[in-house]
Amino acid sequence: MYDWLNALPKAELHLHLEGSLEPELLFALAERNKIALPWNDVETLRGAYAFNNLQEFLDLYYQGADVLRTEQDFYDLTWAYLQRCKAQNVVHTEPFFDPQTHTDRGIAFEVVLNGISQALKDGREQLGISSGLILSFLRHLSEDEAHKTLDQALPFRDAFIAVGLDSSEMGHPPRKFQRVFDRARSEGFVAVAHAGEEGPPEYIWEALDLLKIKRIDHGVRAIEDERLMQRIIEEQIPLTVCPLSNTKLCVFDHMSQHNILDMLERGVKVTVNSDDPAYFGGYVTENFHALHTHLGMTEDQARRLAQNSLDARLI
């Protein structure tokens, strides 16, 4: 079944480029940039990839991202991810990147963007993988900081297809960012946002009604609110669900408890994605395979999930 799932044409709509930084590349970049790491070797680092919640993961994620310093680093990161896409027949990807993760430590916005954009361009030309980049605001920072990031992005308007919202969800509701999303949409950006991963269904309502998003990233807690479910089904609002991430971060205790197939059968436009694959134990095919192994996902369900991902593209 793995090989069949791997060959299935699919799109990835929820992927953080910084979260695809495999330990081997992390160590190579640290050596290239002469950065001392708190881990002795790759295996020690992999052993640290055990998380009880989103915040524990984010603490390690931001620590790992510190090795990314130059255009070449960001190119290598993105190119390595695109090669994974090619190997798994991901024909289209819409990755997030978090400029504030890098600008806050003194890396110029254009350094980050140039490296990523060149790799995506090469991916289109050399690998045949279409793509669109999503600029994501960090919700644990202030809305003023998000405005500054948008200011930095506007000269490179054509490099992005959308703005997003990610990082620590609890205590940072979507309404905190209503003004910057209003401004981004007025500049022509489409909006997406993480909501309903650890946060309650109310956060999904806010993302839809205040941020006016076109796609919900995660959204698994929508199933707790029947009125919300009806709206998502009726309006066919896509959900970019990340099964391995959800179990690794204890949103669900075990994959057998995941609700993605229940949502699929109710008519929700759910998609399968890897989120931060270097940290969560698998790329898109591994996520599909986990659904087959633990939830008994059928070939028909896999085809529908893959088609949903292609239908839910922003471009």
Swiss-Prot record:
Documented EC number(s): 3.5.4.2
Known cofactor(s): Zn(2+)
Cofactor, free-text remark: Binds 1 zinc ion per subunit.
Residue numbers binding Zn(2+): H14, H16, H194, D275
Group of enzyme by EC: hydrolase
A single Gene Ontology CC term: cytosol
Active site: E197
Reactions accelerated catalytically: adenine + H2O + H(+) = hypoxanthine + NH4(+)
GO biological process, one term: adenine catabolic process
Keyword DNA-binding among record annotations: no
Annotated positions for site Important for catalytic activity: H218
UniProt keyword terms in alphabetical order: Hydrolase, Metal-binding, Nucleotide metabolism, Zinc
Family to which the UniProt record says this protein belongs: Belongs to the metallo-dependent hydrolases superfamily. Adenosine and AMP deaminases family. Adenine deaminase type 2 subfamily.
Protein name: Adenine deaminase
